[in-house]
Amino acid sequence: MAPVANLPIKTTLSPANQTELAAAVAEAYAGGSAIYPIGGGTSLDFGLPAKTPGSGLSLGGLTRIVDYPARDMTVTVEAGVTMKTLSELLAAEGQRLPLGVPLADKATVGGVVATNWNGPRRYGCGTVRDYVIGISAVDGRGMSFKGGGRVVKNVAGYDFCKLLTGSLGTLGVITQVTFKVRPLTEQFTLMACAVQTTRQAEKLLAALVTSATTPVAIELLCGTTWDSEPALKTLAGASGPEKLYLVVGFEGSAVEVEWMTGRLHDEWCALGIEAPITIGDAADFWKKLVDFPAVGNAQPADKDTAPLVLKASLVPSGVTPFIDALRTLDPPASIQCHAGNGIVIARLSAFPKEGLSRALVGNLQPAAAAHHGSLLVLSNPSGSEMTHQSVWGGLDVPFALMSAVKQKFDPKNILNPGRFVYV
């Protein structure tokens, strides 16, 4: 049973199947009571704090593997299946879903889709929206609906797959998902180099755009977490408080990966990089990259020590200037950037002395906006100063249209009320 300490619920409902789940939502609709969907409990801090009393709705009973025609390279599972279980199922057939989800042993399929969580491989492999081809859900009236199907090239009906992805369970409780999957690759390798300044990092990132290689991940790292990482301690060429680490991932056949790592090594050396390395235990380091946003944030969290975690979405050229802004605010902050996609995730070393609102609204949000981006709070276990502006920032989205869609799917506003961007 997922921890629910930070939700205002009196009881948690545990339906055993999709029919029982729909009935539970219909009953809540009739009584006008709030419903809070709960998967693995790994992202319950995301969004505004829930204030409306209601009931939790556990997806723990929805764990069926509905259909897996491996030759068609699609899989249909219920929303309570964990990402680890799904990965093991696919691996047995030489396949995978390359999303890179933190805490995969707890995170559920429904939760991953609802939060639109994408890991370091998004640069080369895409995002959740690229893999969801069919979806079933229950709306705020307890009515079941579905979109897409089990065929990759299915264009029938409304695109509920993309609509529900990232909706935080506010339009419907996801009950079942169909993914298209990919083959496992023969080899995966991580190359790394140390960088002296953000200016030098920007030059290396620009060079990757014209590189003959095709990375699947481009990670720019800095801060206390990465300075103490054993796999990076052997790197030469950088020292001092401004140093960063650039980690690039390649996958494919053994021949392809060997050629790309050799080529990138030569390209980096030509740019003045000293002794780039191939990380020995790529799988272990990769797990640290994937889990970084959730370290210290797995439920239940110690509110006094769990970090404040922020996420900025920018144009890629804004990554290094935003790192500078973060370091000005909190020099020891641990930072991970999916640099090829303009995503920056920061775990602050301490709660801002000037307060969350002033640090974010007055400082970091304008820094993100300067690079056509936005800033979100992924996790703030303290719960302090969690306002719409501080959590969601100045999002440039059509709020009126989004609210109209919300009204159609959830007319009584019982699904995760008050947690998303709707005003």
Predicted region positions:
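Conserved glycine-rich FAD pyrophosphate-binding loop
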Residues: 47-53, 60, 104, 271-423
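N-terminal glycine-rich flavin-associated loop
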Residues: 2-35, 59-105, 113, 117-150, ...
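Short, conserved charged micro-motifs
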Residues: 20, 84-85, 199-203, 254-262, ...
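Anion (oxyanion) recognition and catalysis
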Residues: 29, 91, 209, 269, ...
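Active-site beta-strand/loop segments that form the cofactor-binding cradle
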Residues: 26-50
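Residue-level signal for inorganic ion chemistry
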Residues: 39, 80, 248, 346
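C-terminal substrate-binding/cap subdomain adjacent to the FAD-binding core in PCMH-type
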Residues: 114, 133-300
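Short, glycine/charge-rich beta-strand/loop segments that flank catalytic centers
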Residues: 40-42, 99-110, 133, 224, ...
